[in-house]
């Protein structure tokens, strides 16, 4: 009996080893099959992405601009002076990108690419070149529209920038350093970036897709091949790519583009209030639960805000059912609504929520017939000038008090704390 027990034990051990061996083989085979499936999926996705990019590239253009510069000084005289035989003229050249947005030749790009240029030349993906006409440019948003007379154009599809998510894969296409039709891949790093100090109206999509000089005006697209942003600027200490790029959301760019095509300029809404972000201290003082919204610090006399009944201390938390996270967002919403638009504001007043309807006015840029004294602050990184009589009256300030910021240096202390061109420093 003991001998049989030993033989049975050996037999069980042999079968156990045999079964374990085949289980290991089956596991390895299954793992290999899974890896092959994953690899095939990656290859399929890669080919699909390449096909999509190839299609979208037909809508991306290379832009070359020229601007005449008159020489100044003893050796560089004004060329318009016919009595000067040594008159000389210089041409400044620049490069950028753009997206074809219609079959009849409209192209969306940046103001800093084509604004104030004497000549604009557009090169299509197939190498054809066309002289372009500047339809309109909007420096406050850095958006511009040009047009070419060409046939068989392939416009880009418009996406919805409000729907994109942080972490979503995106692709940038453009002409960095003149290298045409360059494609880079990245993700959306952040949405709603403001207080960057690049433009007056900021609501940027931030991406780590490589963007370099020459990419400006080109498209940022999603994996469906739809335009979600206009590549505009980079954050860099050396002028090159450092992983932080900014694009104007297509929803914002489209509103501006439509105004430029229809009127040649942008008509923005004006509420007539001074605003600031709600800090933790202010939230506690006003008895609100969080720092979302925009605090009204001043109501301009005879403004739409005053007419509608807004008062100092109101906290605006929604505009037409859209949540307001900060003052920059409120400013953008009011501007986008346009002149004479009826908007519904949801505000917190003394701890209670109120609904206020406002008919906006048109935001007018400050103008004056005589040059104003300009001052600069190298420490803060701002350029300011005295208030014109028109601005003093419109903003409700006393004559001779305050200055208006005309320029903010990117990355300066002023930019970091949120100062922007157009703001008034009263004290």
Predicted regions and their residues:
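N-terminal secretory signal peptides that target proteins for export/translocation
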Residues: 1-11
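Bacterial N-terminal signal peptides
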Residues: 16-27
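Processing junctions and N-termini across compartments
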Residues: 23-25, 299, 408
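Serine-dependent protease modules
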Residues: 31-344, 348-390, 400-401, 410
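C-terminal soluble interaction/assembly domains
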Residues: 406-427
